[in-house]
Amino acid sequence: MTLVILTILILAYVLIATENVTKVNRAAVAIFAGTVGWVLYVCFGMDFVTSEHLADYSRFLHLGDADSTSTTVKYFISRNVFLPWVGRAAEIVLFLLATMTIVEILNNNGCFDFVRQLLRTRSSKKMLWTLAIVTFLISINLDNLTTTVMMLTMMHAIIPSRRQRMIYGSAILLAANCGGALTVIGNPEGLVLWNSGAVTATVFSFSLLLPCLAAWLIPTAMMMRMLPERVDTEWIVMPFRGDDTRLNAWQRQLMLFVGIGGLWFIPTFHNITKLSPFLGALCVLSILWIVNEIFNRKLMNMDAMVERRTPRVLQYGVIQMILFVMGMMMAVGVVKESGAFDDLMNLLGGGEVRPNVWLHGIAAGVLSTVLDNFATAMNFFSLHDVVGLGDPSMILDPNYSTNGLYWQVVAYCVMAGGNVLGIGTISGLALMKMEHMHMGWFFRNIGWKALVGGVAGLAILWLSHTLMGGTIYLMI
């Protein structure tokens, strides 16, 4: 049955990788694989429990003074195997939901209108770097999908030329993905590592700073040659928000400070309380929500308030991303609980000598070019457990301990690989749908540049680890 569950996951990966051909939504595929996998796991629960959780199951029977029956096994799986994976997935989903709602509140109140003012230029190069820099900085604080769609919406309203929109949109995509990979709150992969204790926020960002900058700056600089000297723009009136009077500048600045500043405080909140980061995100959301209602109390009872809406493409993208993350975590969870990953590592000799970290990273990067980078990352993260401080194996191989090299390399490589064809991320799919781009055009004009930047960033990561002896996190 382990082989059947693994086959379902592999077929799901094939459908996810060929979404642009089959037109089957990857979120639906991930959810189907996760639910069917757990149903099969429960149906053959006795085999899995005795092979993977025998000690825990014996303790469960002893404490409950119960006999081992099929019902008892199912109850044990439900409470002790299934629910922990639901909790891990819920931590990521609730964090994403909170941060995306924060973005919606800020955007509806015009807190990002300053970006449109920065884009008032006819210089194509200035437009390119303004879009790229603003996107990179925003994606450091917010998730990359939300940042990508928000910036694409702004850019789409300003630039009428489809070809120029494709180039600028690609620059936005690269900046959002590279910026999101720089922090633990910038994309789901970083959140998974942070929640599992594989990395800490400060060390993770310091380690990937130079590689992410290289992966972003090099292809963006190469894209300058694709643009004319001047860019055609169309300027429209600032968006109507339900009332002729908008929030004052200081009110928008305060809301922006509460939202973005609160997100930056979440790592500190986590370090102090040891509670899950999603609780900190919900706390920030609640404070921002209260401030929003205080500032907009005069509009709350007006029919015009209904006009404050988020673009439909953002709403759809948010729902798709949340469901996809939930489905993939459940699918990978059932495969891990079946023992398939342990068998694979034993087959590769993982019980004695772990495979090379850099080969793992390169393999993850190659897979993420066609397979979703989150799905790829989840599989490679699940191959190894985080080595604790008291574990003797940490001295022999610290690459898999907290802030170990393995987690950094895989996180970086899946980001870099996802930029090559554009289909490796949900953000890339959003860009292709909005601008009707083809994968072939993307690779010929953007993908190979992203590959050059990604390889350069990986070389920088290798050099920094080699020169620092892999001990950079001990000095921070």
Q: Where in the sequence are the language-model features?
A:
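Structural signature of hydrophobic alpha-helical transmembrane segments
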Residues: M1-I8, G87-A98, I140-T148, L208-W216, ...
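Transmembrane helical segments that form the transport core of multi-pass membrane transport proteins
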Residues: D56-D67, G87, E104, N109, ...
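Interfacial loop-to-helix junctions that mark the boundaries of transmembrane helices
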Residues: M1, V21-R26, H53-D56, K74-I92, ...
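Cytoplasmic-side transmembrane-helix entry/capping segments in multi-pass membrane proteins
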Residues: R26-T35, Q117-T130, Q164-L174, G317-I319, ...
